[in-house]
């Protein structure tokens, strides 16, 4: 457990209500639907770094089963209220599932992990997925790894795709795309979105 992680979790614990308000205009339904298109039946999805539970609620509305999970106690409380499903408080590196989920949705969450820790975390996500399972993850588009306004961020570009998904962690990329932030006031910010499949 690093100081960067502690600061980020503390941020969400103390500013949960403010964060919920700040993303109230963020509609991720298009990205969610793009992810859901890879499932031919009802899926069991781990919403990893679920935040307010916004996306968990949407997945449930589309007929899927979801487990919201977040390292922040306050975010888990909000997500439980929003989604109607009890969220699990757990850090990325403490994931302990095996062949459990059809999909893992990590929207704007893995970006809070330090770069050197991401390979191990992604291997744990691989363990949690059933064979052929689908992973979505998104990062702010860029090359920085730094603290910003009380939270730690690891940015990514297309050049980082082989680092994120490779033979060692058992993922192959199905598609990736660059999008603009869905919040009108942040339309100048870009995101790297990745959808990958568990291949081993």
PLM region spans:
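Conserved class I S-adenosyl-L-methionine
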Residues: 1-40
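Class I SAM-dependent methyltransferase SAM/SAH-binding core
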Residues: 46, 52-94
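A short acidic, Gly/Pro-enriched loop at the edge of an enzyme's catalytic core
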Residues: 93-104
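Conserved beta-strand signature within the Rossmann-like core of class I S-adenosyl-L-methionine
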Residues: 132-139
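Acceptor-substrate binding/catalytic loop of class I
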Residues: 137, 145-160, 183-185
């Amino acid at each position: 457990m690093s100081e960067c992680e502690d600061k980020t979790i503390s941020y969400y614990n103390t500013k949960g209500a403010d964060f919920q308000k700040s993303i109230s205009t963020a509609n991720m339904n298009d990205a969610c639907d793009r992810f859901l298109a890879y499932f031919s039946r009802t899926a069991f999805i781990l919403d990893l770094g679920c935040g307010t539970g916004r996306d968990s609620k949407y997945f449930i509305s589309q007929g899927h089963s979801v487990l919201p999970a977040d390292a922040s106690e306050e975010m888990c409380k909000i997500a439980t209220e929003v989604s109607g499903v009890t969220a699990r408080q757990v850090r990325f590196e403490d994931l302990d599932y095996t062949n459990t989920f059809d999909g893992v949705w990590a929207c704007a969450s893995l970006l809070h992990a330090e770069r050197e820790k991401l390979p191990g975390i992604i291997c744990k996500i691989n363990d949690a997925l059933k064979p052929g399972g689908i992973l979505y993850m998104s990062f702010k588009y860029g090359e920085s790894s730094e603290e910003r306004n009380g939270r730690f961020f690891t940015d990514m570009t297309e050049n980082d795709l082989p680092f994120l998904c490779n033979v060692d962690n058992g993922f192959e990329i199905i598609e990736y795309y660059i999008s603009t932030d869905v919040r009108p006031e942040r339309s100048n910010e870009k995101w790297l979105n990745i959808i990958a499949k568990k291949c081993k």
